[in-house]
């Protein structure tokens, strides 16, 4: 594939940006086009409510959007999309298909990898998950003392933690009748210790999520949990009633003491950060019930079908991806804020930090050459309105442009005080995107200060600080209610956005070699931390840090 910067549509966009970007003004665009909202928004009518994607408050016009769509087409987005859904091994560095879409393929149409339809295997594991969830949630599955399970602990890291954690938090209102859920990921002993302190061994069930069953953090935490558990049960045979494996390594699972009957498998065509749809989502299904888990899958499948069948010009994941390309590759933006105005979605941005940054934090193209353009952004964010009292100052008046996605449900799960809280939340959501778009002109700020009775001297001093440039781009994503179906659709929306950007940048969004080097070095350093002998095998900084740690670790601090 030709370098992105040599692509003629990319160059047309560069020329347009050079000649026009200084003059594009959102206020003027809205004033000039009364239909701008209708022309630059999508109303997705799902079978479980609507998702409105309003992208009218972006620094684009119809000409720019058409050039961006032409760029996507010329970069092979449609072909790569079809290849992914068809089981082609588009993860070329690992020679793997990319088929998280198969896990939620509710239409059950065949998806073939290596001449074999994967859907029978997918359905078999889903049925096993359904049966297991029913047994645990009904109380039929008993612990070693005959008590039902009250607490589930998911032990995993990365994709085996972030997705299930985000979804179980987002869907708490649907967890009625389910066990409590806990997540342990960090190798820091504080995480497992503080979790175990809340639990009773005889009614706790541990899910150990590791494809290879060799992930250091996960297995170390699982062994600690087993040691704690056996301290109470004093019978190794009871491990089978309290530990479940999500893995493909049967021998390691048996070695740990888990009955292979209690092992739920998944496949190498499921990437970790796309795995919540697989057996890795068992903790989700146990918490909210399998029927609701299926609704999550159905919502994602709905978005898959929209992404696969809708022309690029009206395709929500594609349009969000192209707007990101516009800001990253032409405006030089380095970050993207995800700002959900729903407390249940408080882990949404953290989840897509991995989803986006591990996928598109790459600098080498499919042909093995270094890119000559920017790729994945830094993704961050917090729920509204908390963020308004923390970092919105920089978004409004800082020196960096930060494109933002604002997300909110029209209906709240908790309409307390006759909906007052949610009305205030909605008002703040709407006000922020309008304020970022419009800003406050010098004249408007001056009139405001005069109306407040400021003296000429105070007015002159305060005026520059009260001006807001505006022209800050945002997307507004408004949905009827945060249900399992809608959450599934929203997650898939962003997954496909990330995929489209990776195709345009000509990088592999489905490997993660960048996480390996640090892990390799940590294995070498770990034995060097034993004893008191000085270490000289590293650079002076690392040697000095090791020396300091050895000096300080036995000092008694009250």
Swiss-Prot record:
Catalytic reaction annotation: alpha-D-glucose 6-phosphate = beta-D-fructose 6-phosphate
Protein keywords: Acetylation, Cytokine, Cytoplasm, Gluconeogenesis, Glycolysis, Isomerase, Phosphoprotein, Secreted, Ubl conjugation
Tagged with keyword tRNA processing: no
Catalytic residues as annotated in Swiss-Prot or TrEMBL: 358 (proton donor), 389, 519
Modified residues annotated as N6-malonyllysine in this record: 454
InterPro entries hit by this protein: G6P_Isomerase (IPR001672), G6P_Isomerase_C (IPR023096), Phosphoglucose_isomerase_CS (IPR018189), SIS_dom_sf (IPR046348), SIS_PGI_1 (IPR035476), SIS_PGI_2 (IPR035482)
PTMs per UniProt: Phosphorylation at Ser-185 by CK2 has been shown to decrease enzymatic activity and may contribute to secretion by a non-classical secretory pathway.
Coiled-coil stretches noted in the UniProt entry, renumbered to this chain: none
SUPFAM superfamilies per the UniProt record, alphabetical: SIS domain
A Gene Ontology molecular function term of the record: glucose-6-phosphate isomerase activity
Function: In the cytoplasm, catalyzes the conversion of glucose-6-phosphate to fructose-6-phosphate, the second step in glycolysis, and the reverse reaction during gluconeogenesis. Besides it's role as a glycolytic enzyme, also acts as a secreted cytokine: acts as an angiogenic factor (AMF) that stimulates endothelial cell motility. Acts as a neurotrophic factor, neuroleukin, for spinal and sensory neurons. It is secreted by lectin-stimulated T-cells and induces immunoglobulin secretion.
Self-association state and partner proteins as the record states: Homodimer; in the catalytically active form. Monomer in the secreted form.
PANTHER family, per database record: GLUCOSE-6-PHOSPHATE ISOMERASE
Name recorded for this polypeptide: Glucose-6-phosphate isomerase
Primary gene name: GPI
């Amino acid at each position: 594939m030709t370098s992105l910067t040599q692509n003629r549509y990319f160059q047309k966009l560069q020329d347009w940006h050079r000649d026009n970007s200084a003059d594009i003004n959102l206020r003027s665009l809205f004033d000039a086009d009364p239909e701008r909202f209708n022309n630059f928004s999508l109303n997705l009518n799902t079978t479980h409510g609507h998702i409105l994607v309003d992208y009218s408050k972006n620094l684009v016009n119809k000409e720019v959007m058409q050039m961006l769509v032409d760029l996507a087409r010329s970069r092979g987005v449609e072909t790569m999309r079809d290849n992914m859904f068809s089981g082609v091994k588009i993860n070329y560095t690992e020679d793997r298909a990319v088929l998280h879409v198969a896990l939620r393929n509710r239409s059950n149409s065949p998806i073939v990898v290596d001449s074999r339809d994967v859907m029978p295997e997918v359905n078999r594991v889903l049925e096993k998950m359904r049966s297991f969830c029913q047994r645990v949630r009904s109380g039929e599955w008993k612990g070693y003392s005959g008590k039902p399970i009250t607490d589930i602990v998911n032990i995993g890291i990365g994709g085996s933690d972030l997705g299930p954690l985000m979804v179980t938090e987002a869907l708490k209102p649907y967890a009625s009748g389910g066990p409590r859920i806990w997540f342990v990921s960090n190798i820091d002993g504080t995480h497992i210790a503080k979790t175990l302190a809340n639990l009773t061994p005889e009614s706790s069930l541990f899910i150990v999520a590791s494809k290879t069953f060799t992930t250091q953090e996960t297995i170390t935490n699982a062994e600690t949990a087993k040691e704690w558990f056996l301290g109470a049960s004093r019978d190794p045979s009871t491990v089978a009633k309290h530990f479940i494996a999500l893995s493909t390594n049967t021998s390691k699972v048996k070695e740990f003491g888990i009955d292979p009957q209690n092992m739920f498998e998944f496949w190498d065509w499921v990437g970790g950060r796309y795995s919540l749809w697989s057996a890795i989502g068992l903790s989700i299904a146990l918490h909210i019930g399998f029927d609701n888990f299926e609704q999550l899958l159905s919502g994602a499948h709905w978005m898959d079908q929209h992404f696969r069948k809708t022309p690029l010009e009206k395709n929500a994941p594609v349009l969000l991806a192209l707007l990101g390309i516009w800001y990253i590759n032409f405006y030089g933006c380095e970050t993207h804020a995800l700002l959900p105005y729903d407390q249940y979605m408080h882990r949404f941005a953290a989840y897509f930090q991995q989803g986006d940054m591990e996928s598109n934090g790459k600098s080498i193209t499919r042909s093995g050459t270094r890119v000559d353009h920017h790729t994945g952004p830094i993704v961050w964010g917090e729920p509204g309105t908390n963020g308004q009292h923390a970092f919105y100052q920089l978004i409004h008046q800082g020196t960096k442009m930060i494109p933002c996605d604002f997300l909110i449900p029209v209906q709240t799960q908790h309409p307390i005080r006759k909906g007052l809280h949610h009305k205030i939340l909605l008002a703040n959501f709407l006000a922020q995107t309008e304020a970022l778009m419009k800003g406050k002109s010098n004249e408007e700020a001056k009139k405001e200060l005069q109306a407040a009775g400021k003296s000429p001297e105070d007015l002159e001093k305060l005026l520059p600080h009260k001006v807001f440039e505006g022209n800050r781009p945002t997307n507004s994503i408004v949905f009827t209610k945060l249900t399992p179906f809608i959450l599934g659709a929203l997650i898939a929306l962003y997954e496909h956005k990330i995929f489209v950007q990776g195709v345009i940048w000509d990088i592999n969004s489905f490997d993660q070699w960048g996480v390996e080097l640090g892990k390799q070095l940590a294995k070498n350093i770990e034995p060097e931390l034993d004893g008191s002998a000085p270490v000289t095998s590293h650079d002076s900084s690392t040697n000095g840090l090791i020396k300091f740690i050895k000096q300080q670790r036995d000092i008694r601090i009250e």
